[in-house]
Amino acid sequence: MDSDAAPSVTPGAVAFVLENASPDAATGVPVPEIVLQVVDLKPIGTRFTFLASDGKDKIKTMLLTQLAPEVRSGNIQNLGVIRVLDYTCNTIGEKQEKVLIITKLEVVFKALDSEIKCEAEKQEEKPAILLSPKEESVVLSKPTNAPPLPPVVLKPKQEVKSASQIVNEQRGNAAPAARLAMTRRVHPLISLNPYQGNWIIKVRVTSKGNLRTYKNARGEGCVFNVELTDVDGTQIQATMFNEAAKKFYPMFELGKVYYISKGSLRVANKQFKTVHNDYEMTLNENAVVEEAEGETFIPQIQYNFVKIDQLGPYVGGRELVDVIGVVQSVSPTLSVRRKIDNETIPKRDIVVADDSSKTVTISLWNDLATTTGQELLDMVDSAPIIAIKSLKVSDFQGLSLSTVGRSTIVVNPDLPEAEQLRAWYDSEGKGTSMASIGSDMGASRVGGARSMYSDRVFLSHITSDPNLGQDKPVFFSLNAYISLIKPDQTMWYRACKTCNKKVTEAIGSGYWCEGCQKNDAECSLRYIMVIKVSDPTGEAWLSLFNDQAERIVGCSADELDRIRKEEGDDSYLLKLKEATWVPHLFRVSVTQNEYMNEKRQRITVRSEAPVDHAAEAKYMLEEIAKLTGC
């Protein structure tokens, strides 16, 4: 452009945008030239927003993420002038505010000294909108006092092609997916709302759920969900029912890019939504879905990995977590009977580790157990790395993870975190002794490491508050003595040697495991017991799992059972007595359980350690210093 020319804006452009929220070039109607000034430019997250001014009116405007580099490079500046080549005017937020979303533009002038102000027009004059289709310029209207226009040189008639003719020619030479893209411009996900009609989106499938069946008062059916991500990283959940679910389930593949149109939107149910979007999409059997070949610029699955030693605070909560780790072991497929409908579903447990030197058990369900689980079993000797998105955290066996309907697993992903993990495992992790996070939860929480000296409380702090742990598990550290281990309690249970679940005596001989669906000649014993502990403020009963109980008693449940049977009750009682009146550090969780319609507080030991008197003295000196301000 001529740098000496005085830049101007298009009068009435804001009013035109408000009246024409989504112009469509495929209709053959020329797109008007819209020149606006950038006012009050500022960043919001990864995008930039400003007020677009036509000299008289202003409208709140947002640039897509793909245009953000233009701002950072200085091409687009405050008080600059831009020509809008493609846009959507949408209603956003609870206030139903009109927002201009610019998807394509060119810079007319980087920055002026001041804001452009147009004088008030006479009432009879209408704003001039200059329409500029390619290779032609037509003035639809002009002010009455405007100077005469220069002569217009028309090209030979045979060379003139309408916009619709050009589009039709391009369609004929294009591949199906490209043809769909040319039919209408692609809309960003952020611009969609339930009141829009025709739109096309280009998105990547970043999560794909299982095809599930349901039964309600209206009958039976099937449903599945996908999570879709566009070039700006905006996400939306799409749901398909019955015939649409059967049609699109095999069509949608995780990680691929698609053009989608003829769907509908509604306000998302906040209780069930899985992505940050005010709306959710429904696709029926009339929706159009076509794969887009060779599209790599749309973001892949976005992870928010949590280290294994930082999983503790997520126990029992609704928040799902993403985990990346090295596969250590893979169990055979088990058949589990679901209590709700008595249906048998496949399950497989895998154990993964990361560079926090902790391991965690992850339960794979349904197709993930039989497909990906089998793949992992076949390659477990090579210690593959897996990235899993959307895992539920529970307190089963201390702490464990399990997949849900929308969980996704990528084996040996091409991620920086995977490269770092592989380097760690090959150099030192392979020979490192690792502990299960389920048996040692004193390790961490989000925001920093937690130790046996973090969240230290007296027993009275827990026992004096009957509502503690009512909403979700809370975690504390204790320094207490074991005052009693009742010898007549149920100290252990018979467990399957494969999965550690409870077994029953089989008819004839052996032991039956419902989880493994098999009969074994032998079983093992695993501790499940309670102990009474005391500190200067009181006493309480703590529940123990096998790993912590073995360290406290000093032998396995099988060994203690042998002592009782072969050496008699005196040796058995002596073994338990030797474990009492010894100080221990405990990391515990506090929850509420209901028994006989009465809520009771349950304190469970998550990890245990002997008292390090030097470390304990240092901790006490630090606490004293905090109190005295020294």
Curated annotation (Swiss-Prot):
Expressed in root tips, roots, shoot apical meristem (SAM) and young leaves, and at lower levels in mature leaves, flag leaves and ears. Residues 200-282 bind DNA. One of its GO terms (biological process) is telomere maintenance via telomerase. Keywords: DNA damage, DNA recombination, DNA repair, DNA replication, DNA-binding, Metal-binding, Nucleus, Zinc, Zinc-finger. The keyword Transferase does not apply. InterPro entries: Euk_RPA1_DBD_C, NA-bd_OB-fold, Rep_factor-A_C, Rep_factor-A_N, REPA_OB_2, Rfa1, RFA1B/D_OB_1st. GO terms for cellular component: DNA replication factor A complex. One of its GO terms (molecular function) is single-stranded telomeric DNA binding. Induction: Repressed by sucrose starvation. A zinc finger (C4-type) spans 496-516. It is found in: Nucleus. Belongs to the replication factor A protein 1 family. Component of the replication protein A complex (RPA) required for DNA recombination, repair and replication. The activity of RPA is mediated by single-stranded DNA binding and protein interactions. Probably involved in repair of double-strand DNA breaks (DSBs) induced by genotoxic stresses. Heterotrimer of RPA1, RPA2 and RPA3 (canonical replication protein A complex). Interacts with RPA2A. This is Replication protein A 70 kDa DNA-binding subunit B.
